[in-house]
């Protein structure tokens, strides 16, 4: 199996290269379960967290561990936006997003009770990997609908040509094959 080296701080991993679309391969970064990599990313991103940040905003599933680790380091709360509607949700904020990297459209959901926690807050968006920027753009729209002000866009890894200004720790390629 072909692998690609990724590094955050002093932590290096060799991750598998997978095909996402015909002729397009990416290093598959899955941070869940890798405590050392998550901790290194949290420590690295914490250095870029603006002092005016009140809360972190992330989405399920993979970036939760990163947001949790940053939260534990800085004492700021975090809110998780869901990728599926949950039965308990009341009057949720709904935002469509298309992930160009994986070619799959999805919907983001934020329960109104969670949205209330963001009202008037300065939030930092936390991601594991940002590629096209489509999902992060949708998350920013959720934050604004909830009445929050986005003060930072943070990601452990950046991949591709996102036009968004994102603070990231490491770059990973999109590999094209003929």
Spans of model-derived segments:
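Active-site-facing substrate-recognition patch
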Residues: 1-53
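Short glycine-rich phosphate-binding loop at a beta-alpha junction
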Residues: 53-60
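Conserved acidic residues
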Residues: 54, 121, 151
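Gly/Ser/Thr-rich loops at beta-strand to alpha-helix junctions
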Residues: 60-65, 132
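Short, ordered loop/turn segments at secondary-structure junctions
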Residues: 61, 83-85, 156-159
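Short, glycine/charge-rich flexible loops or terminal/linker lids adjacent to PRPP-binding catalytic cores
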Residues: 76-123
């Amino acid at each position: 199996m072909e692998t690609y080296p990724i590094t955050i701080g002093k932590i290096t991993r060799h991750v598998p290269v997978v095909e996402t679309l015909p002729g397009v391969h990416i290093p598959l970064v899955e941070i869940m379960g890798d405590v050392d990599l998550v901790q290194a990313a949290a420590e690295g991103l914490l250095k870029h967290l603006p002092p005016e940040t009140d809360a972190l905003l992330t989405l399920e599933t993979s970036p939760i561990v990163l947001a949790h680790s940053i939260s534990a380091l800085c004492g700021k709360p975090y809110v998780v936006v869901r990728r599926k509607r949950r039965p308990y949700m009341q009057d949720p904020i709904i935002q469509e997003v298309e992930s160009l990297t994986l070619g799959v459209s999805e919907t983001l959901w934020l329960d109104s009770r969670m949205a209330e926690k963001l009202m008037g807050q300065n939030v930092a968006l936390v991601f594991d990997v940002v590629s096209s920027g489509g999902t992060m753009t949708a998350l920013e729209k959720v934050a604004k609908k909830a009445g929050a002000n986005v003060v930072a866009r943070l990601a452990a890894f950046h991949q591709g040509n996102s036009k968004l200004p994102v603070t990231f720790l490491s770059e990973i390629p999109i590999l094209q094959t003929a």
